[in-house]
């Protein structure tokens, strides 16, 4: 079978496998690629190739992640799988692999385990919107009642962490048997196709960045004589058109102005959209009224804040992080989008210190207001060196 070029006409969705160690995440990933490859929908990626995923650096943090892709009738999927538990935590906190839906793999003979809980909680915290469950290794359990119990326990656990436990699809099967089956019509492969159908049906098409309200972090400010002030940056989401109202948010009181021009590579455009590096000309704005670190946004779409809750991963010494723990009252810089702001970290009750390599839930109080929202990623830095990564889980004020 020759390589089929993936058609980009289908909606694109990002998914990933999560769950406890040895419950079968990587086996399932390999089985999906094998069975879909037989239908010309993927390239088979064997287990050991996924397991020996190369390390990537994301914001200075080393994460081992395997990427595979496949398609169904409805969609094109990019799927991530991480070899180690720590890689998952880093992945979810840095948003290196943003997931529109997660496939939670749970071994039926084990039931939910500590990492199962942690991955569900993290999915909720970092904003993974949908979970589909693959109940693996059902061939290892003789008693159907035990399988039902595990299923009940899982639904309760999902509900406890804010997912709709009663509605979450639970597909039962054996990833190993599906991986070993060479005939795509073999009954052992049925679970793979059921899983794909469940993801197709249950995880909605994500809202594309271009359809969200406009936001561009300011990287640079210029004044062009006779024309006014231009702010440049990469459009994070949405579309900006000439003569639309915008707000400048962060550091100082928010103010409104009008976009009087959009330029890209010195050419004038009618609009700039998500992913474009553009210059936006602002009406009647002085050069000293705007600065790097503020954002240009659709009015009312984002507000400045100083206090929030976050999930944070602290880099290990080997990752270039701190060599020593930090304590309550720690004051590093928090790097949001294009700038550093000093803030104070409050540690959770009963936590006296945080060691390199830990992940914690924390509260942060910034000394100046910044345009913030839930699920925004940030780096924690000391003197320009990244020592941690975080994601906002809740805005306080």
Curated annotation (Swiss-Prot):
Region (G5): 174-176
Region span, G2: 60-64
Pfam families given in the database record: GTP_EFTU (PF00009), GTP_EFTU_D2 (PF03144), GTP_EFTU_D3 (PF03143)
Positions of region (G3): 81-84
GO cellular component term, pick one: cytosol
Any GO MF annotation of the entry: translation elongation factor activity
Binding site for Mg(2+): 26
Compartment(s) of residence: Cytoplasm
Keyword Hydrolase: yes
InterPro entries attached to this UniProt entry: EF-Tu_GTP-bd, EF-Tu_GTPase, EFTu-like_2, EFTU_2, G_TR_CS, P-loop_NTPase, Small_GTP-bd, T_Tr_GTP-bd_dom
Region (G1) location: 19-26
EC number(s) reported in the record: 3.6.5.3
Binding sites annotated in the UniProt record for GTP: 19-26, 81-85, 136-139
Main location: cytoplasm
Reaction catalysed by this enzyme: GTP + H2O = GDP + phosphate + H(+)
CDD domains: EF_Tu (cd01884), EFTU_II (cd03697), EFTU_III (cd03707)
Region (G4): 136-139
Residue span(s) of domain tr-type G: 10-207
Entry similarity comment: Belongs to the TRAFAC class translation factor GTPase superfamily. Classic translation factor GTPase family. EF-Tu/EF-1A subfamily.
HAMAP family, per database record: EF_Tu_B (MF_00118_B)
Quaternary structure and interacting proteins, as annotated: Monomer.
Known function: GTP hydrolase that promotes the GTP-dependent binding of aminoacyl-tRNA to the A-site of ribosomes during protein biosynthesis.
PANTHER family documented for this protein: ELONGATION FACTOR TU, MITOCHONDRIAL (PTHR43721:SF22), ELONGATION FACTOR TU-RELATED (PTHR43721)
Name of the protein in question: Elongation factor Tu
Organism: Syntrophobacter fumaroxidans (strain DSM 10017 / MPOB)
Lineage of origin: Bacteria, Pseudomonadati, Thermodesulfobacteriota, Syntrophobacteria, Syntrophobacterales
């Amino acid at each position: 079978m020759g390589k089929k070029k993936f058609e980009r006409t289908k909606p694109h969705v990002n998914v990933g496998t999560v769950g406890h160690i040895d419950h079968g995440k990587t086996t399932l990933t390999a089985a999906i690629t094998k069975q879909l490859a037989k239908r010309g929908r993927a390239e088979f990626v064997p287990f050991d190739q996924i397991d020996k995923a190369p390390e990537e650096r994301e914001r200075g943090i080393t994460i081992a992640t395997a990427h595979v892709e496949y398609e169904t009738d409805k969609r094109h999927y990019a799927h991530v799988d991480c070899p180690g538990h720590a890689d998952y935590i880093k992945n979810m906190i840095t948003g290196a692999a943003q997931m529109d839906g997660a496939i939670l793999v749970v071994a039926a003979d084990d039931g939910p385990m500590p990492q199962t809980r942690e991955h569900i909680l993290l999915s909720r915290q970092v904003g993974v919107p949908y979970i589909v469950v693959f109940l693996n290794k059902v061939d290892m359990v003789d008693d159907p009642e035990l399988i039902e119990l595990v299923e009940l326990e899982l639904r309760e656990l999902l509900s406890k962490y804010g997912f709709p436990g009663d509605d979450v699809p639970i597909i039962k099967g054996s990833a190993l048997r599906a991986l070993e089956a060479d005939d795509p019509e073999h009954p052992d492969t049925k679970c793979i196709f059921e899983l794909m159908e469940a993801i197709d049906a249950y995880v909605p098409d994500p809202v594309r960045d271009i359809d969200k309200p406009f936001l561009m972090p300011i990287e640079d400010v210029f004044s062009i004589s006779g024309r006014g002030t231009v702010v440049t940056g990469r459009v994070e989401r949405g579309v900006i058109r000439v003569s639309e109202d915008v707000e400048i948010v962060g550091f100082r009181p928010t103010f409104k102005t009008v976009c009087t021009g959009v330029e890209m590579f010195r050419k004038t455009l009618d609009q700039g959209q998500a992913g474009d590096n553009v210059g936006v000309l602002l009406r009647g704005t002085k050069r000293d009224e705007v600065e790097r670190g503020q954002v240009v946004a659709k009015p009312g779409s984002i507000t400045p804040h100083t206090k929030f809750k976050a999930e944070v991963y602290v880099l290990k010494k080997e990752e270039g992080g701190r060599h020593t723990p930090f304590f309550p009252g720690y004051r590093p810089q928090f790097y949001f989008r294009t700038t550093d702001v000093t803030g104070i970290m409050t540690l959770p009750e009963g936590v006296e210190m945080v060691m390199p390599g830990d992940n914690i839930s924390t509260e942060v109080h910034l000394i100046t207001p910044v345009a913030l929202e839930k699920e925004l990623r940030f780096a924690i830095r000391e003197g320009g060196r990244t020592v941690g990564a975080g994601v906002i889980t809740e805005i306080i004020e």
